[in-house]
């Protein structure tokens, strides 16, 4: 491996060379820190060697970021956002891979809707993946067809911000997901204990008379699903 302060040549969004600008990764990696630093100072390549040079001072150079929870609101709520505009915003922020949630209209609980999202995502500048729902129409009553959704390209099963209150359904979902080697993501919050969404229960919520959401609502659901 190579760990040092070094020059990086980035072209077309790809790291083309690491190390001395007129050397290469292997040569730079084979030298000690002092030698590498010396070469970096003495073997600079002038800007004239490149058709375009972007000054990246003050910027961050990093691998593409990944957001595993996005809401592009497509289909059904495109007056808020759609896959194209969401992907453009992601790219502008340095995110090259995103995972769309299934709370669209219709819900991504069927192969047709899932394929719509994935196909539209292929036309954007980033990798657009999608979750599929655990339960049909997010009702928490009947499981979706995990197998066909996985085969169609789903990466994870989740009912997004809606907690699954049926313990038997959760157990069946876990068993099926395990058999298919697929991850599940649950919203672990029991609404029976919540007086007011959007604020934790505590001194401030009591002072404002809002009731709030106690930590107990989360503890109970997590404990149930870990048993």
Region roles according to the model:
Residues 68-81, 129-142, 210-215:
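Active-site mouth loops of central-metabolism enzymes
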Residues 117-123, 146-151:
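Acidic (Asp/Glu)-rich catalytic clusters
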Residues 1-64:
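Histidine-rich, glycine-flanked metal-binding segment
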Residues 84-108, 124-136, 150-165, 181-189, ...:
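Divalent metal-dependent hydrolysis catalytic cores, especially in the metallo-beta-lactamase
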Residues 67-70, 95-100, 126-129, 200-210:
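Gly-rich Lys/Arg/Thr-decorated short loops/hinges at beta-loop-alpha junctions or inter-strand turns
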Residues 26-28, 32, 50-57, 87, ...:
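Short amphipathic alpha-helices and their capping/turn segments at secondary-structure boundaries
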Residues 57-121:
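Metal-associated gating/positioning segment near the N- to mid-region
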Residues 141-227:
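Histidine/acidic residue-rich metal-binding segments in metalloenzymes
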């Amino acid at each position: 491996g190579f760990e040092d302060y070094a020059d990086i040549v980035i072209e077309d969004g790809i790291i083309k060379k690491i190390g001395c600008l007129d050397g290469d990764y292997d040569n730079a990696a084979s030298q000690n820190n002092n030698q590498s630093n010396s070469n970096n100072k003495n073997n600079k390549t002038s800007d004239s060697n490149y058709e375009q040079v972007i000054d990246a001072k003050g910027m961050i150079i990093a691998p593409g970021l990944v957001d595993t929870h996005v809401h592009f609101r497509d289909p059904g709520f495109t007056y808020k956002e759609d896959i194209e505009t969401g992907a453009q915003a992601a790219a502008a922020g340095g995110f090259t891979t995103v995972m769309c949630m299934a709370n669209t209209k219709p819900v991504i609980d069927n192969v047709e809707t899932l394929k719509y999202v994935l196909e539209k995502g292929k036309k954007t500048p980033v990798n657009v993946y999608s979750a599929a729902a655990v339960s049909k129409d997010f009702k928490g009553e009947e499981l979706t067809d995990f197998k066909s959704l996985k085969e169609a390209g789903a990466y994870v099963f989740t009912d997004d911000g809606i907690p699954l209150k049926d313990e038997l359904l959760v157990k069946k979902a876990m068993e099926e997901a395990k058999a298919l080697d697929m991850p599940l993501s649950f919203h672990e919050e029991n609404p029976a204990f919540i007086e007011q969404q959007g604020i934790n229960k505590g001194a401030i919520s009591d002072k404002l008379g809002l009731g709030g959401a106690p930590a107990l609502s989360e503890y109970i659901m997590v404990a149930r699903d870990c048993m």
